A protein has these predicted regions:
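Fungal secretory targeting signals
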Residues: 1-21, 185
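N-terminal leader/targeting pre-sequences
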Residues: 17-185
Length: 185
């Protein structure tokens, strides 16, 4: 009898561990803030580009992503990561994806249910970057789960974004910077 109780308890804990926490819609963003991140100029990749983020209301953020140098008809992944890129430019030092609600990477993000994805999984929520050779990828989308307010768990303004190959190799990265009228902060 005791072993059945223990097994039942362990099963319940396993279910709780696999339960996904949905990210809340951000409703207190600052409509005057603009963030920009430029990818590095690196010898080991042709991928270049930038990402901008802004909002005209308190709900969600609008992102514009432009990437060039996507070779071989690849669909590249891109995410906001926990840490900034260090001065040596090491994209692997940026840590894991921004995931303040502990969702984890498995199962993969469901583009049809973005509240259940990692907050920083931009390509999972909005689609991967693809462009034929010699052309650029351009995407603009609204993300309701990221924040431009310091102190919010989903705040991205002091973090980085990383572009990955399909096998998750980190190709390039850059830090977000807040842009103020007349120049960078």
């Amino acid at each position: 009898m005791l072993s059945k109780s223990i097994l039942t308890g362990l099963f319940g804990l396993a279910l709780c561990a696999n339960a996904q926490t949905e990210a809340p819609v951000v409703t207190d963003n600052c409509p005057t803030d603009l963030y920009h991140s430029q990818l590095q100029i690196k010898d080991n990749t042709t991928v270049r580009g930038y990402i901008d983020a802004w909002t005209d209301s308190e709900i969600g953020m609008t992102f514009r992503v432009i990437l060039t140098g996507i070779e071989g008809h690849q669909a590249l992944l891109y995410h906001i990561h926990e840490n900034q890129v260090p001065e040596d430019g090491n994209c692997y030092a940026t840590g894991a994806h921004l995931d303040p609600y502990g969702r984890g990477e498995q199962p993969p993000c469901d583009i049809g249910n973005p509240a259940t994805c990692q907050v920083g999984d931009l390509s999972g929520k909005h689609g991967p970057a693809f462009a034929p050779d010699g052309t650029e990828f351009i995407a603009e989308f609204r993300d309701f789960f990221l924040s431009n307010v310091p102190g919010n768990p989903a705040y991205f303004g002091d973090r980085s974004w990383v572009v990955h190959a399909p096998d998750k190799t980190r190709l390039n990265c850059g830090n977000f910077e807040k842009i103020v009228p007349g120049g960078k902060k």
